[in-house]
Amino acid sequence: MSSLPGCMSLAAAPAAADSAEIAELQQAVVEELGISMEELRQYIDEELEKMDCIQQRKKQLAELETWVLQKESEVAYVDRLFDDASREVTNCESLVKDFYSKLGLQYHDSSSEDEASRPTEIIEIPDEDDDVLSIDSGDAGSRTPKDQKLREAMAALRKSAQDVQKFMDAVNKKSSSQDLHKGTLGQVSGELSKDGDLIVSMRILGKKRTKTWHKGTLIAIQTVGLGKKYKVKFDNKGKSLLSGNHIAYDYHPPADKLFVGSRVVAKYKDGNQVWLYAGIVAETPNVKNKLRFLIFFDDGYASYVTQSELYPICRPLKKTWEDIEDSSCRDFIEEYITAYPNRPMVLLKSGQLIKTEWEGTWWKSRVEEVDGSLVRILFLDDKRCEWIYRGSTRLEPMFSMKTSSASAMEKKQGGQLRTRPNMGAVRSKGPVVQYTQDLTGTGIQFKPMEPLQPIAPPAPLPIPPLSPQAADTDLESQLAQSRKQVAKKSTSFRPGSVGSGHSSPTSSTLSENVSAGKLGINQTYRSPLASVTSTPASAAPPVPPVPPGPPTPPGPPAPPGPLAPPAFHGMLERAPAEPSYRAPMEKLFYLPHVCSYTCLSRIRPMRNEQYRGKNPLLVPLLYDFRRMTARRRVNRKMGFHVIYKTPCGLCLRTMQEIERYLFETGCDFLFLEMFCLDPYVLVDRKFQPFKPFYYILDITYGKEDVPLSCVNEIDTTPPPQVAYSKERIPGKGVFINTGPEFLVGCDCKDGCRDKSKCACHQLTIQATACTPGGQVNPNSGYQYKRLEECLPTGVYECNKRCNCDPNMCTNRLVQHGLQVRLQLFKTQNKGWGIRCLDDIAKGSFVCIYAGKILTDDFADKEGLEMGDEYFANLDHIESVENFKEGYESDVPTSSDSSGVDMKDQEDGNSGSEDPEESNDDSSDDNFCKDEDFSTSSVWRSYATRRQTRGQKENELSEMTSKDSRPPDLGPPHVPIPSSVSVGGCNPPSSEETPKNKVASWLSCNSVSEGGFADSDSRSSFKTSEGGDGRAGGGRGEAERASTSGLSFKDEGDNKQPKKEDPENRNKMPVVTEGSQNHGHNPPMKSEGLRRPASKMSVLQSQRVVTSTQSNPDDILTLSSSTESEGESGTSRKPTAGHTSATAVDSDDIQTISSGSDGDDFEDKKNLSGPTKRQVAVKSTRGFALKSTHGIAIKSTNMASVDKGESAPVRKNTRQFYDGEESCYIIDAKLEGNLGRYLNHSCSPNLFVQNVFVDTHDLRFPWVAFFASKRIRAGTELTWDYNYEVGSVEGKELLCCCGAIECRGRLL
């Protein structure tokens, strides 16, 4: 015990030290802030009290305390009742005992079951006379085995009873079905006071004939026929007998009980008015939608609501969309719920211009705000705003995607198109269709479609099984079936797209058993003095075989090649680094002289490969050139400017001066691609990997001119064993004619600088005539050894037949091979990828896609057996033909409002180093931009292209309402969908799907032989009587965009947008509809309540007057004829709502009118659906297909094909090659170059360009990758595979590239 105080003192010492430190710290805080700790605490408490979240939590806490007190009082009240009841029972028992004692009886506690009689088995045999036979089975214990006869009799009686019961059930069922109609007419068989959780006199909501819901009281539950009806007395007078799906609970359901597809009643706010409408839950609360529910109302509107604005439907239907009256909305909801969470939506951001449909017309509009899945669109014509669901086909990108897929389906059914994914996906700068995913799960999540039950949570429906295709023993049928099982990537490019360097996961790379002794084609690469030919097969090292995989025949042994550097498998601090560049300190002075060969005599290299493997942009500095960056002010804006100073002291400020200097001095060791005037491209910025687990200096083993290093910073996994080949290898059945007689050569002596005299340059220039406008671009091709944008018609480089110097020629780039320094690296979750080790300037050549060239049939077969991850289509012919027919438009113009981003057009030099990295807000990165959700009087819509109209249109169409209106189209406030056809076209049946409707609409709008096609072949339509087209030519927005940027621009960003001939663009006649409302707006019945539109009705009434008074450059009326009119060749007369046809002639607004033939539609439905491929293949076209100027519907012969009529078919260019019908495939799975490792990105930094080098055969271009923007060192290089989502049956590939423009899905 004596040592206890010492222990206590030792324990108290640290505490005292801590208290002293705390005191010192408090004293320091007081001295620094000038306030005491108590004042600081008080200040912090006051600030916390002011915070909204604290006040909200306190309010919630107070409510919780109130609720707890209320519950405690209720519990106490129940306890008191229980105690009182117990006391009363005790008193009652005492009274009973007293009574028994008075009677002289003895009272004892017993159970009622103990005194019950033995059970009696009753067998009822109903007959026609309703006689009941009761047989006492007797005591079970008294039965003996001797009673065999009695048992047999009982069994016979039971069997007879069952037979008679079945017979009576059949008779009763037949009689009840005959009397069912009488029961449904009002013969009430009984009234109930309770039905589940529905009790008479409870508060509920009911639906009135006006389609709005109102509060009331349940006064009766009646059994009518086989169902139940609920009689509701509304608070605002009136009674109604409603079904269970037309009443709702008067409480707000918890969030966990609601799912996508739940049937609810929600509040719709229109200004100061609030209405209750029925709808379905389209989104559950999450962070992106500010914890709100997205509701799709039955009449086509969409809106975000909170939980306190929802009421659950009492007895919803099993398929909730069947309760929607409007057919177009019903089809949309069914497709939406079935496909959820795969929701295609247009990716938008504020300020973008886009075409939006309204009343059957495409109007020029602008994105004002993006709120989750909704976007507020401002119509520039009348400044009207409207909220639209981003997945609605009223937005031009969504409509273009639907129509293109429907058109492809028609061609497949008609045998005009081979069953293959559409390699020209709708990709354009600006709005793109994005497939959102529920990334919280691991796979496809199908939402439950069971109706919301108030007692138990809904059970999800099982996934509908896919019907297997019947196996066919015929060889051709098996081959045809195998063709649809391979996926092929597409190389469609969106010019000028800006995105991140991340990529999506590619298919897993596997090690294969590769024969290393395959022969290749010799390729010439650049040498300063002579052309040196290398044979890849001679340097191919033996590849170790891998046990798994199909057996392959042994190849010839490869001769010994150069030994590869050893791989570092251990953990290193960093990869081997090279010394940094140090600029020389001495200054260069210029003395006036004439530059010649002697200016570079002192720096000419003794060895040809002195700086091989260095950054090509750094090589001029290593040869004593100086690269200086200066600042200068242009138009009150400070910009950067790059100047090169030569060894002789001459300053070079432009690429033209650099090119002239190189030719004047005869410089054959420095080339134009080694110079860059972009101030944001740094030539001495190197990327250094950190602590690799695995490192290889060169995986090409010397086959490439520049070493390709490999590093793994994730684990010790080595790269896949692939036979590296930097050139393409013809496969079985493939012959490439590389003879000089199949080439066109030039005789240039000036390095092919004069494009007008170079035959190879002229091939590139003349090929640009295959554009929609047919105009020749004299500036096409390489500009100072760089390609600023994709050239769809291809680039023709100088070849071995040319007499120009291979080293000095400005038209030789791709054939020189890899020049930039790249690295193969292991990504976190995307397999292996390629990144650059130095900055890459915009337009620079990066690499090619090399591999084995296969025929289409062999590629399909091989893709099923070994995989299709590295397939690429050589479809240059098809891409150019489609481009010529007017399907594509890469260039943003003032009329092509879909996809024009006004912010992107303002491109100039700013003071930041990487201006492209500051991305604008979009619907992905900033889903909820504004905190205050606007509930102003603007319309919201989600579904198909709906036509809403104003009071004036109803007045104009009042005279023809009885004749032109289809039956049962709903109340006047419900817009008529475009899928409902009028005026000679039968309305589609209720069984039609949305895809079939679009396909029927396309085929129904085919133009007859008397139709007119514009010079660009963008669309075909009929000439209206007296409708002459006028030339517009207004380019105000394009001019403003071109002058809004900085006056001084970098060379890499100096891109002039192409312009089409305004005369050709505006040679479009105007077509209007006669005796009908324009855009399928038939007058409606006057029944029902019109949804209040406040000031919108006035704007709608002004639409007709405004559209006729608009500028000729603002409106283009385009109307497709129906099949009956297409055959007769007649045109429609102008309607009353549109005056002169010439007053509405433009590209900015296009009117579309849909119609379909019912019989033709049924025939298409009976056809077997098109079989989809199961092979994904990249396409080597360097651009994307998109719908030009709105819808750009191409007239097809599908209508005549369906009717058995003969229609002329234009011969495809590929058929001139011995009748070939399909393109060739490049497969880089077993043999290939670094291009096989390039991953996908929805916002890539590379684009694909077809280049003709060793042959001018249009079937075999080289597939080259160019930088679409400046790329910072260490950035992963990516390109857009352009898969068409849903094109490969049974395959789904999510995209997680991380780009703002990410489309969500690849397949």
UniProtKB/Swiss-Prot annotation:
Residue location of crosslink Glycyl lysine isopeptide (Lys-Gly) (interchain with G-Cter in SUMO2): 182, 1049, 1055, 1085, 1165
Subcellular location field: Nucleus; Chromosome
Chain positions with Phosphoserine modification: 112, 117, 1042
SET domain boundaries: 820-1282
Domain MBD: 611-682
Binding residues for Zn(2+) 1: 746, 748, 752, 758
EC number: 2.1.1.366
Bias kind Polar residues: ranges: 476-494, 1097-1112, 1137-1156
A GO MF label: histone H3K9 monomethyltransferase activity
Residues that, per the record, bind Zn(2+) 3: 752, 798, 804, 809
Biased composition (Low complexity): 495-512, 1116-1131
Domain Post-SET positions: 1291-1307
Ranges where the record places region Disordered: 127-148, 404-424, 444-512, 531-570, 885-1174
GO biological process, one term: transposable element silencing by heterochromatin formation
Superkingdom field: Eukaryota
Cross-link Glycyl lysine isopeptide (Lys-Gly) (interchain with G-Cter in SUMO1) per UniProt, renumbered positions: 1049
GO cellular component: chromosome; cytoplasm; nucleus
InterPro entries given in the database record: DNA-bd_dom_sf (IPR016177), DUF5604 (IPR040880), Hist-Lys_N-MeTrfase_SETDB1 (IPR025796), Methyl_CpG_DNA-bd (IPR001739), Post-SET_dom (IPR003616), Pre-SET_dom (IPR007728), SET_dom (IPR001214), SET_dom_sf (IPR046341)
Pfam families in alphabetical order: DUF5604, MBD, Pre-SET, SET, Tudor_4, Tudor_5
Post-translational modifications: Degraded by the proteasome, shielded by interaction with ATF7IP.
CDD domains, A to Z: HMT_MBD, SET_SETDB1, Tudor_SETDB1_rpt1, Tudor_SETDB1_rpt2
Tagged with keyword Protein biosynthesis: no
Gene3D superfamilies assigned to the protein according to its UniProt record, in alphabetical order: 2.30.30.140, SET domain
Positions with a binding annotation for S-adenosyl-L-methionine: 830-832, 868, 870, 1236, 1239-1240
Entry-linked PANTHER family: HISTONE-LYSINE N-METHYLTRANSFERASE EGGLESS (PTHR46024), HISTONE-LYSINE N-METHYLTRANSFERASE SETDB1 (PTHR46024:SF2)
Protein name: Histone-lysine N-methyltransferase SETDB1
The organism's taxonomic lineage, starting at the top: Eukaryota, Metazoa, Chordata, Craniata, Vertebrata
